[in-house]
Each structure stands twice: as C-alpha cells, then as structure tokens.
Amino acid sequence: MAAKDVKFGNDARVKMLRGVNVLADAVKVTLGPKGRNVVLDKSFGAPTITKDGVSVAREIELEDKFENMGAQMVKEVASKANDAAGDGTTTATVLAQAIILKVMKAVAAGMNPMDLKRGIDKAVTVAVEELKALSVPCSDSKAIAQVGTISANSDETVGKLIAEAMDKVGKEGVITVEDGTGLQDELDVVEGMQFDRGYLSPYFINKPETGAVELESPFILLADKKISNIREMLPVLEAVAKAGKPLLIIAEDVEGEALATLVVNTMRGIVKVAAVKAPGFGDRRKAMLQDIATLTGGTVISEEIGMELEKATLEDLGQAKRVVINKDTTTIIDGVGEEAAIQGRVAQIRQQIEEATSDYDREKLQERVAKLAGGVAVIKVGAATEVEMKEKKARVEDALHATRAAVEEGVVAGGGVALIRVASKLADLRGQNEDQNVGIKVALRAMEAPLRQIVLNCGEEPSVVANTVKGGDGNYGYNAVXRRIRQHDRHGYPGSNQITRSALQYAASVAGLMITTECMVTDLPKNDAADLGAAGGMGGMGGMGGMM
C-alpha cells in the first residue's frame, strides 16, 4: 500500500481553499453577457475557445493533490448543475466560492462548522421556497425567446430559433444542435416520425429528381423478422394490390427472392412497394416497431406472439397520410393511430424515462417520446471557422437547456436579481444559536455574488451596483448589455428558476461538506514515498555497529 500524506484542521482547509479559488477564478470570468472567453489547450488540433463554465472546470487539474481535492469538489458543483438543468454552471461555481470563502473565516475564528452548515442549509431551503413563489410561468414565444437570447450571450437570432423550434415541435419535441454548412444559423423541422433507415433498393425510387420514394396514403406492414421468402407475403401483396394503395414494409430485413420480387413488381407497376429495415437493434428495435404500430394504427407481425406473416390481413396493417424515404431516412407523416393509444404509449415511455439509470437510455427514450408526440427540430449553427463553430454550438446548447428549464419551472428575474430579492426577504431569518445565525448571514451575503461578478465582468464597481439594486424591488436590476440599472418588464431579462435553484442548492451542498472537513488524506508523490522507505531501511542498519 502506498504511503499517505495527511493534513488536519486549518492546514487542510487552507490547501483546499487555494484549489477552490484557482478553479472558481478561472470559471467566473465567463459569467454574464460581458464575460470573457477562456482558451483551453488541446493535445491535438486547435485550442478550444469557450465561455461555458463547466467546460473550463472540467479541464482543471492541479499539481498539488490537496489543492486539487478542493478544485475537484467545486468542479462537482458545476457538473451537477449542468446535469440537473444544462446551464447555470458558472453561477453555481460563483455561489460555492462565495459561501466557502466567507464560512472558512468563521471556522478559523472558532465557530462550530456543523452549526454553520445547519445555518446555510436553513437559509437555502427557505430561499428555494421563495424562488418558487417568485417564479412566473414561461409559456409564450416571447418569453421563451428572451430566455434563449439571454443564455446565448444576448444573441437574439438563437433565442428566436429556439422559440420557433419549440413552437413547431412542442415542449416535448426533440430539438438538436448540429454543425451548419454556411455562415447563417438555420432551423430544420422534421414533422412526423423519422428514423435512420433508408430504402433497401434504389429501384424503389419514384421521384428521380429528389432521389426519394414518396408514398401517398400507404398501408404499412410491420414485421419483427427477416423476410426472404416471397410466398409469406403473397396474401398481403394481393390484398394491397386490390385496394389500389401503395405498401411500405418495415422489417428486420428484406432480402433475396422477396426483395427481388418486390423490385420487379414495383418496376412493372403491378403494386407500388418500398421496403426499409426496422430502426434500432434487439429490444430497442421491438420497442420502436411497437411505437410505429401505435402511431399508424397497425399491428407488429411477430412470431413471438403467435402471428404469422402468411395470415396477415389489411386490418393488421398500419396507415399514414404520407411516407417519404431517402437513402438514409424514413419519415412517416400523419399516422392514423388513435390519439388515446398514442398518449398511452407516450405515458408508458415517460415512466421508463423516470426509471432509466443511464443517460444514453434516457436520451433514446426521450427521442421516442418526441417522435410520437410531435417531431424533431434541428438547429444548424453557422460559423466562419471550426473554432468559432465549437464555441457557438456550446452557447446554443446552453441556451436550449436554459429554455427547457424555464418552460419546466418558470422564470425569475435574471442577472442575479432574483437571489438579491430572496436575500432581502430572508433578512430576519434566525437559527437556533449564534453560529447558525452566522451561517444564515453567510448564505444570504453569498447570494449577491452572481450579480457582483456580472457587474465586475462589465468593468463596473460591484458594490455600488449591488447596493442600488438592493434598494429597488421586483425586476429592478442591472442590464449588463446596456450597462445601466433600470426597471424591466416581466420579459426584460428572465432567468430560469430551475437553473437558479439548482445552482444555489448544489453550491450550498458542496460548501457544507468542505467546511465540515477536518482531515485530508492523499498518496505521497512517488519520490517522497521512496525517500521515506530508504530512510527507514538505513535506520535498521544501525545495529551493524556491534558486529565490528
């Protein structure tokens, strides 16, 4: 077992505090619309330029192991805030540093760390309730656009694109951010259900000018098996031909004789058919086939439940208003499935999302909900260079997360003003003893830190602005873009309640753990450990003197 280095009490806390300050000082320069960029060196390729707090935090590793422990604990604040709300990482880091700096002084003065922690926890618990009371719903497009604009560093184009995307695919719809091909940001909306599987043969193409297959009011056959024998399909093909409608086949695979016969029939005009592979693999494929069946009012033909393809009838087939298939994707528009059945399926998947343990599973389940509930919107980010593209894409993703959080829990006054208002309301809050009262005061004072840092990053005097804002009420706050203090309307500069709440809770949680730390243990560097071992060995040789 490796030798350990151990530090106690104030020595441990001082080292930890140094690490906290290094990380927080690097992160907090990015806060607010006038926040600065941070350049991150990469082992290969061009350096990354970012204004994203969690991206900066994740890059920081300190040489001193005790200082690094402090930095890593604050890094946890940024990561947790990012996981919970997708944004607010810099705010959380600034709050954590403010609480830790002030409360460490109280601990050094001899106050009880446990009572200080209880005071901080009490203040934060009441503050969260006050934030909830202050929040107003964020439901109209103007409010959504404002939240997106603020979070994207006052980029109005991004805010409007996010609001438009939410308007088209709904609050539950999937909105993704991708690299664009030009200089302008674009919004691409895919209505209906789209999955990543294209036609199995180019001979199915009936729109040569677009290289796509378009089927109007088709029947849709869903089979959870490979189809290689055309005899299995003859009854269905004959029934569809009599009905005079096209047919889309979605199966695990269609190959050999079956595929060749379908191609020949299509080319001769006997029946208009297209075949694609089912999306996904294994259990996910079965689930997605069932989603398509629910959306189109069809039944999945599966031997697992005793259904045979030869016995399938028109009643087992799904239907849609239109299907578009190209080389890589299939889009089903306006399936005829019953609304109640679709909502039931969505509720079932939402339950699975709550129970999911991995982020990957959760993301895939959310995509399925979106495909059933509305559609998918893609925001394509335009930029002149790859470095700018990365930075802008990160900002758009943050804005998207902030907007979703605002829709979920409402908005409060942004720019740190909501925390100032909450702190003013809690001025008379008291604990069970004087040490707890100090903890409460520390938490309330720390709530000013985000506003102060935003003002500092604008090159103004934080104390003057903070005191002026404290003298007002409601949305009276500092506009960092125009660099002036003014009364704003409800949509002036809103911030997400969820992001503000998460930042405060995670900052207080980690600060509480750090102030109650009395001992830190880490491995000795290898050189120090080797020297220690060698000294021990030489000491044992003292007995050799008696042998001379």
UniProtKB/Swiss-Prot annotation:
Its EC number is 5.6.1.7. GO terms for cellular component: cytoplasm. It comes from the Bacteria. GO terms for biological process: protein refolding. ATP binds at residues 30-33, 51, 87-91, 415, 479-481. It is an enzyme of class 5 (isomerase). Keywords: ATP-binding, Chaperone, Cytoplasm, Isomerase, Nucleotide-binding. PROSITE patterns: CHAPERONINS_CPN60. It is found in: Cytoplasm. Its main location: cytoplasm. It catalyses: ATP + H2O + a folded polypeptide = ADP + phosphate + an unfolded polypeptide. One of its GO terms (molecular function) is isomerase activity. Disulfide bonds: none annotated. Together with its co-chaperonin GroES, plays an essential role in assisting protein folding. The GroEL-GroES system forms a nano-cage that allows encapsulation of the non-native substrate proteins and provides a physical environment optimized to promote and accelerate protein folding. Belongs to the chaperonin (HSP60) family. Forms a cylinder of 14 subunits composed of two heptameric rings stacked back-to-back. Interacts with the co-chaperonin GroES. This is Chaperonin GroEL. It comes from Stenotrophomonas maltophilia (Pseudomonas maltophilia).
